[in-house]
Amino acid sequence: MIARLLILIARAWQLGPSRVLPPTCRYAPSCSEYAIVALRRHGAIKGGWIATKRLLRCHPWGGHGYDPVP
């Protein structure tokens, strides 16, 4: 249930502010898509933690390129 709510929030981001703002994600798939896959695959707690770690890595001095969900 919590995972679905978090997925809904990520989806709202994709359909709302993300379409207006310039793309800034350094990774593929995008951070929001990565979060959705992580939440579906691992659930709210573990998937949320995986998504949070990805968001913390997404900055100008972080990595880049293809980064699949474990």
Curated annotation (Swiss-Prot):
The record's comment on protein family reads: Belongs to the UPF0161 family.
What PANTHER family does the database record attribute to this sequence? MEMBRANE PROTEIN INSERTION EFFICIENCY FACTOR-RELATED
Which GO cellular component term is one of those annotated? plasma membrane
Task: Cite the entry's keywords alphabetically.
Answer: Cell inner membrane, Cell membrane, Membrane
What main location does UniProt list? membrane
**Name of the protein in question:** Putative membrane protein insertion efficiency factor
Localization in the cell: Cell inner membrane
Its record classes its membrane topology as:
Peripheral membrane protein
Upper classification of the organism: Bacteria, Pseudomonadati, Pseudomonadota, Alphaproteobacteria, Sphingomonadales
One Pfam family, short name:
YidD
